[in-house]
Amino acid sequence: MAKIRQKTKRAAAKRFSITKNGKLKRKHAYRSHLALGRSTKAKRHLRKDAIMSTSDTKRYTQCL
């Protein structure tokens, strides 16, 4: 008989990806609209992916 496994949470799978070292990569918030007041430098930094903190990584790896 096959083992029961936890299903992948599709909402989490669409938002996070796992790096080679097991860390979680995510996109920055505050990118969609109302960016006129932000400087070009701030918007450029938001374009890059962010690495999730280790405490959150433990919680979200179970969802993936």
UniProtKB/Swiss-Prot annotation:
Entries under PROSITE patterns matching the protein: RIBOSOMAL_L35
Family matches, as HAMAP family: Ribosomal_bL35
GO molecular function: structural constituent of ribosome
Family matches, as NCBIfam families: rpmI_bact
Keywords: Ribonucleoprotein, Ribosomal protein
UniProt name for this protein: Large ribosomal subunit protein bL35
GO biological process: translation
CC annotations in GO: cytosolic large ribosomal subunit
Chain segments annotated as transmembrane: none
Family: Belongs to the bacterial ribosomal protein bL35 family.
UniProt cross-references to Pfam families, sorted A to Z: Ribosomal_L35p (PF01632)
Entry keyword Ribonucleoprotein: yes
InterPro entries per the UniProt record, alphabetical: Ribosomal_bL35, Ribosomal_bL35-like, Ribosomal_bL35_CS, Ribosomal_bL35_sf
